[in-house]
Curated annotation (Swiss-Prot):
<dbReference type="InterPro" id="IPR036116">
    <property type="entry name" value="FN3_sf"/>
</dbReference>
<dbReference type="GO" id="GO:0043235">
    <property type="term" value="C:receptor complex"/>
</dbReference>
<comment type="similarity">
    <text>Belongs to the type I cytokine receptor family. Type 2 subfamily.</text>
</comment>
<feature type="topological domain" description="Cytoplasmic">
    <location>
        <begin position="762"/>
        <end position="979"/>
    </location>
</feature>
<dbReference type="GO" id="GO:0008284">
    <property type="term" value="P:positive regulation of cell population proliferation"/>
</dbReference>
<keyword id="KW-1133">Transmembrane helix</keyword>
<keyword id="KW-0225">Disease variant</keyword>
<feature type="domain" description="Fibronectin type-III 2">
    <location>
        <begin position="433"/>
        <end position="528"/>
    </location>
</feature>
<dbReference type="InterPro" id="IPR003529">
    <property type="entry name" value="Hematopoietin_rcpt_Gp130_CS"/>
</dbReference>
<feature type="modified residue" description="Phosphoserine">
    <location>
        <position position="889"/>
    </location>
</feature>
<feature type="transmembrane region" description="Helical">
    <location>
        <begin position="741"/>
        <end position="761"/>
    </location>
</feature>
<comment type="function">
    <text>Associates with IL31RA to form the IL31 receptor. Binds IL31 to activate STAT3 and possibly STAT1 and STAT5. Capable of transducing OSM-specific signaling events.</text>
</comment>
<dbReference type="GO" id="GO:0019838">
    <property type="term" value="F:growth factor binding"/>
</dbReference>
<keyword id="KW-0732">Signal</keyword>
<dbReference type="GO" id="GO:0002675">
    <property type="term" value="P:positive regulation of acute inflammatory response"/>
</dbReference>
<dbReference type="Pfam" id="PF00041">
    <property type="entry name" value="fn3"/>
</dbReference>
<dbReference type="InterPro" id="IPR048497">
    <property type="entry name" value="LIF-R-like_Ig-like"/>
</dbReference>
């Protein structure tokens, strides 16, 4: 015990000595100035790193000290930053501190110094600052190289929205340096003649591969060099959103979150942010490999409460979010499986499913959704392992989609995903009768009934309608009925019935059964045809119809309608109205503007006989007429004309035609009576006349001037406006006297045509009466007296070859001088004082002598020819023949003779009409044409016939030649005879 007391006394004495020493040290106020200050640089982070020590600290003592750091730039007097750094200092400890510079360290020289202050409660007051350490100079420019231009910082990484300072260093102060940010010039502040700094405030994110900044040095127009940097701007790291953890099997926690914007940059400057999951109760940490989810294994140590911290981190910042939860409250079940339907009929079904078991005695809350026919029904049920639910009140022949999902019934967290299946209920017999209506048209001796019915809705059809039964029963003969089966999907049929009353039933059938019958009665009496049609106006909402109630008992009304211009079978509709209703609105999307619709309103008696009550017609919206009438101009006179357009149909127009506008233009620009001035759409003026009666389709425009020019244009109009614009039709009134001339000339022309027709019909009689046919001499029987040699030649006889047996003086023309064509000789007056004859002479060289001669004379032809020497008897001396010149070529004469032999006189060719007088018969004499007998032998009997063809004596013909086959025609002396 005494030893312990001695030891205790010794300890306290030692402690007291130590406190006394400390007090002495403090009393001495030894200086604690920082020493051994060293400054290093980090160009990547653009930071200064300081390290120093503090001398004169007591051995194994710790003191709380404050260090004040001062940083200057370019020169020591330019202090840019002053700050304090507090820490606990140990004996012989090396202290560290870093400072990041906004200006790149390469752009300027920096100076650093430090002083200290003891801030420890163990030291008595007052405390005082130590002396400043000496300035420590930091310069990085010496290590940049020898280029003339530099831009700093290199590849700096900053966050979007921060402020950044860049600079350039130019070795040559004579250079002009321009800097650009993404092609746009920027302006900075000159720090010294070699350095200029640029402050970029709130830099934006442009691209993940960085923002381009470059500077160009030049002297005059000569570029000295270009340098640039890439400034990497990162998106701001966001705090994870919607951080949540849950389990589906109590073995694994599945944590998810929304990572927000990815902060990854190109060139591997910064990867995507990383996520770390830290659980504070267990102290475990896990680096997540996915950016939006992470799994955490649940241990079997019955831990139920978890406190998770999710840390997001990149090179620039960290973000974290925390959740605290109980494991049993975060159960997210797996999907149900094995969904099936049992005992499915037309209206009921049983749905079954299974769930994944996770714990014993676990209760599941399941939700069922049933979708069908546009409706959704929802049911909830609690189960242990297997689920089952009875679905009732279903529609027949309907496809349903049923699905189920489950959750923890004790601590609801969220529903599982859906699991579902489709099923279809069975068909049932149709539950409603078809809606039936009819159109009855009367024909001689029968009714034509067109039945229509609307297809049953899916709700009432209860399946696919296969056919319709139409039963027709004659009410006058109850035992007589007919059954017509109409296959679906037809919705109409046509029946031809006699003039009896009939009851018609329509029944719809599917694979299960038949619907109730829809009954309609066709009366033997015709419908009420005395109902007048009333015009109505529609609106955008449809047609509002009203009618007077039918006297007597009615079970309802039917309103049917159709397009006025189309086939009734293609657009026929009807609507049933209750017995106490006398108005309705017909509204449907099928109504179109400009289309006329006809409505008929029927009342249905208790016997289901329809009676027509009213007819109405109208447009849901009237439009202007779609076309103009084709106008004809009739009865055009000098003072008026009539316009008519009888063929214009008003029924097919897109509105009720209320009348017509007649526009008239004239050069006088004065409107006639009944017309008024109007201005057209093109600004031109004209006269306008309004016809208010749409059935009046003619107009007489009178009080016009003769020989005047007019233009007209007719257009119909409805309540919506006029018809389309068109060109004016031109018309000119005739002269005032032209009609009188027409009245005179037309009868004259008619008379002339009548005479010509009569003459044509009596042409044969006129010919026989006025100019009968002249007999053909070659067909005369006298020719049988003449004997021809083989191959005879037609010749003109010489004068000496024919001795006349009689002389007949035809005429004694006055003495004239005649130029004979063939010989170019003329006859004196003394030579022509006596009658002359023309002789036909033979021209054959082997002519043996005179032969028989036939002379024909016809004084009905050219008198001049007969006077100058026709076929006659002239007292001419045979010893003094006078040759008559050839009047035509021998070839033409021969052709003419041959023609006369073959044809009648009227068939002589046109080329031979130059012959004025040609004998039709020449004796076939043979001999030399040049040898004429001096003593002509008396010719045998010479038959006479009137010469039929005259030859023009005025034609100049060529002289005869030796090769001619015909002799010339000569003029004989008196006493000679010719044939």
């Amino acid at each position: 015990m005494a030893l312990f007391a001695v030891f205790q006394t010794t300890f306290f004495l030692t402690l007291l000595s130590l406190r006394t020493y400390q007090s002495e040290v403090l009393a001495e106020r030894l200086p604690l100035t920082p020493v051994s200050l060293k400054v290093s640089t980090n160009s990547t982070r653009q930071s200064l790193h300081l390290q120093w020590t503090v001398h004169n600290l007591p051995y194994h003592q710790e003191l709380k000290m404050v260090f004040q750091i001062q940083i200057s730039r370019i020169e020591t007097s330019n202090v840019i930053w002053v700050g304090n750094y507090s820490t606990t200092v140990k004996w012989n400890q090396v202290l560290h501190w870093s400072w990041e510079s906004e200006l790149p360290l390469e752009c300027a020289t920096h100076f650093v110094r430090i002083k200290s202050l003891v801030d420890d409660a163990k030291f008595p007051e007052p405390n005082f600052w130590s002396n400043w350490s000496s300035w420590e100079e930091v310069s990085v420019q010496d290590s940049t190289g020898q280029d003339i231009l530099f831009v700093f910082p290199k590849d700096k990484l900053v966050e979007e929205g921060t402020n950044v300072t860049i600079c350039y260093v130019s070795r040559n102060i004579q250079n002009n340096v321009s800097c650009y940010l993404e092609g746009k010039q920027i302006h900075g502040e000159q720090l010294d003649p070699h350095v200029t700094a640029f402050n970029l405030n709130s830099v934006p994110f442009i691209r993940n591969k960085g923002t381009n900044i470059y500077c160009e040095a030049s002297q005059g127009n000569v570029s000295e060099g270009m340098k640039g940097i890439v400034l990497f701007v990162s998106k701001v790291l966001e705090e994870p959103k919607d951080f949540s953890c849950e389990t589906e099997d109590f073995k694994t926690l599945h944590c998810t979150w929304d990572p927000g914007t990815d902060t990854a940059l190109g060139w591997s400057k910064q990867p995507s942010q990383s996520y770390t999951l830290f659980e504070s109760f267990s102290g475990e940490k896990k680096l997540c490999t996915h950016k939006n989810w992470c799994n955490w294994q649940i241990t079997q140590d019955s831990q139920e409460t978890y406190n998770f911290t999710l840390i997001a981190e990149n090179y620039l910042r960290k973000r974290s979010v925390n959740i605290l939860f109980n494991l049993t409250h975060r159960v997210y079940l797996m999907n149900p499986f094995s969904v099936n339907f049992e005992n499915v009929n037309a209206t009921n079904a049983i749905m079954t499913w299974k769930v994944h078991s996770i714990r014993n005695n676990f209760t599941y809350l399941c939700q069922i959704e049933l979708h069908g026919e546009g409706k959704m029904m929802q049911y909830n049920v609690s189960i242990k392992v297997n689920g089952e639910y009875f679905l009732s009140e279903l529609e027949p022949a309907t496809e349903y989609m049923a699905r189920v999902r489950c959750a923890d019934a004790s601590h609801f967290w969220k529903w599982s995903e859906w699991s579902g299946q489709n099923f279809t209920t069975l068909e049932a017999a149709p539950s409603e009768a078809p809606d039936v209506w009819r159109i009855v048209s009367l024909e001689p001796g029968n009714h034509t009934v067109t039945l229509f019915w609307k297809p049953l809705s899916k709700l009432h059809a209860n399946g696919k309608i296969l056919f319709y039964n139409v039963v027709v029963e004659n009410l006058d003969k109850p035992s007589s009925s007919e059954l017509h089966s109409i296959p679906a999907p037809a919705n109409s049929t046509k029946l031809i019935l006699d003039r009896c009353s009939y009851q018609i039933c329509v029944i719809a059938n599917n694979s299960v059964g038949a619907s109730p019958a829809s009954v309609i009665v066709i009366s033997a009496d015709p419908e009420n045809k005395e109902v007048e049609e009333e015009r109505i106006a529609g609106t955008e909402g449809g047609f509002s119809l009203s009618w007077k109630p039918q006297p007597g008992d009615v079970i309802g009304y039917v309103v049917d309608w159709c397009d006025h211009t189309q086939d009734v079978l293609g657009d026929f509709q009807w609507k049933n109205v209750g017995p106490n209703t006398t108005s309705t609105v017909i509204s449907t999307d099928a109504f179109r503007p400009g289309v006329r619709y006809d409505f008929r309103i029927y009342g249905l008696s208790t016997k289901r006989i329809a009676c027509l009550l009213e007819k109405k017609t109208g447009y849901s919206q009237e439009l202007a007429p779609s076309d103009n009438p084709h106008v004809l101009v009739d009865t055009l006179t000098s003072h008026s004309f009539t316009l008519s357009w009888k063929d214009y149909s008003t029924e097919s127009q897109p509105g009720f035609i209320q009348g017509y506008h007649v526009y008239l233009k004239s050069k006088a620009r004065q409107c006639h009576p009944r017309f008024e001035k109007a201005v057209l759409s093109d600004g031109s003026e004209c006269c306008k006349y309004k016809i208010d009666n749409p059935e009046e389709k003619a107009l007489i425009v009178d009080n016009l001037k003769p020989e005047s020019f007019y233009e007209f244009f007719i257009t119909p109009f409805t309540s919506a406006g006029e018809g389309p614009s068109a060109t004016f039709t031109k018309v000119t009134t005739p002269d005032e006297h032209s009609s009188m001339l027409i009245h005179i000339l037309l009868p004259m022309v008619f008379c002339v045509l009548l005479i010509m027709v009569m003459c044509y019909l009596k042409s044969q009689w006129i010919k026989e009466t006025c100019y009968p046919d002249i007999p053909d001499p070659y067909k005369s029987s006298i020719l049988s007296l003449i004997k021809f040699k083989e191959n005879p030649h037609l010749i003109i006889m010489n004068v000496s070859d024919c001795i006349p047996d009689a002389i007949e003086v035809v005429s004694k023309p006055e003495g004239t001088k005649i130029q004979f064509l063939g010989t170019r000789k003329s006859l004196t007056e003394t030579e022509l004082t006596k009658p002359n004859y023309l002789y036909l002479l033979p021209t054959e060289k082997n002519h043996s002598g005179p032969g028989p001669c036939i002379c024909f004379e016809n004084l009905t032809y050219n008198q001049a020819a007969s006077d100058s020497g026709s076929c006659g008897h002239v007292p001419v001396s045979p010893k003094a023949p006078s040759m008559l010149g050839l009047m035509t070529s021998p070839e033409n004469v021969l052709k003419a003779l041959e023609k006369n032999y073959m044809n009648s006189l009227g068939e002589i060719p046109a080329g031979e009409t130059s012959l004025n007088y040609v004998s039709q018969l020449a004796s076939p004499m043979f001999g030399d044409k040049d040898s004429l007998p001096t003593n002509p032998v008396e010719a045998p009997h010479c038959s006479e016939y009137k010469m039929q063809m005259a030859v023009s004596l005025r034609l100049a013909l060529p002289p005869p030649t030796e090769n001619s086959s015909l002799s010339s025609i000569t003029l004989l002396d008196p006493g000679e005879h010719y044939c």
